[in-house]
Amino acid sequence: MSIKVDPVDTNFTVFIRLPFPRGDFVDPPPVEWNASKDQALWDILSRPSKGDIDWKALAENFDVTLQFLLQQAAWLYDRQLSQVRAQMRKVNTTQSTSPSPALGSVSGSAALSGQPQRETLATGSRAPSRQVSQQKDIPLRAPENRRTSFTSTTATNLTPGSRDPTRTGTPTIEDKEPRWDSFGRRPSAVRREQPPVASLPRSPPLEEEPLSSSSPEESGSDEEDTTRRAPLFKRFGKFSTQRSGLRDDEDNEEDTPAFLPLAREHEHTHHERPVQELSTTLRLDAERAAAQRRHPEQRAGPRAPVPTDSSTSSMSSGGRSSLPDGARPTSQGAPVLSPQSAAERQNSRKSTASGREASDGTPSMGSSFSDLDDASVTQSALEEALLSNMQHGGMASRMSTISHALRSRYLQ
């Protein structure tokens, strides 16, 4: 059973015991004070006043003592400030854009000579203004970063010497281009690459993305470049790896590859014809000796290009030193020969073809003889060198060197 108590006209009497003697303390006279007097006092306190408040006159108006009036004013201020603190906590937690307090509390807080009201308005509007400024700063900084990064990448692209104006939108591909050019390729190969590179601006422009997203694009573009450019290295034939020393010299002299047809011709002859015996070399020597007896007047040819030691070393060793000597006279062209010397050249080419069959993939014997033919070294100089070598007893050592080279090549 719950007892219902009427809340109307409820009076409480409170007795307070103090732990110290009061002495000659006299109890204050009873004061009549109600809520209407509280509201009237707060209206006076909250109004902006030009000067100080006359508390004595105000106490006489309310018919109370001065001490009671000051205590009541302090209590009203404390209540209003507690409401302001609660509003400030709400502003800090919710971070709302309109944290204006209630109108009644604001009008009450303005009684402190206008300072609490200004403080609430300033602190209330300070947090949202920071938020708005941060929101404004964030989208403004991002386009500036994007713009500056893109202009810096395009500036770095233009400085290395980009040939196409359409490549400025793809700086990742352009940065890789000087690296590929530094491999010492021929200018003709670089010209062959330009048509596929011109179709590369299909990649998305960097203006729509931040700079950090270009790293996967670089790896993807590297793979595409390697897949597109890898077949270009296979066009040079079988001996392109052995002629890497010639590329730096030929880039300065001419654009067309000088030894590509010879390399292909060597490949066809090596694959089509079988390896012959050593008797073909003996027949070669006999034919040269007979041709030397028939034409003694042609022995005054230049001896300087083919000394005896160099001919022996070119037959025995499989080095690449004879290639640059034959590479440069080839570009100069052979002189016009008479029909008789042309027939001798035909015989010498047949013999060099047989000598070319004896070697496997190395361009030591075949390419050195073909280079000497193309370099217009006369037949008489070769025959004279061979005859002098035979007369001095070097034929046996020469044949043993050739047989040793063939044996080490085919019988290993």
From Swiss-Prot:
One of its GO terms (cellular component) is phagophore assembly site. Residues 92-379 are annotated as: Disordered. Signal peptide: none annotated. Residues 115-136, 329-354, 361-379 have a biased composition (Polar residues). One of its GO terms (biological process) is autophagosome assembly. Pfam families: ATG29_N. Plays a role in autophagy. Functions at the preautophagosomal structure (PAS) in order to form normal autophagosomes under starvation conditions. Also plays a role in mitophagy and regulation of filamentous growth. Belongs to the ATG29 family. This is Autophagy-related protein 29. It comes from Penicillium rubens (strain ATCC 28089 / DSM 1075 / NRRL 1951 / Wisconsin 54-1255) (Penicillium chrysogenum). The gene is atg29.
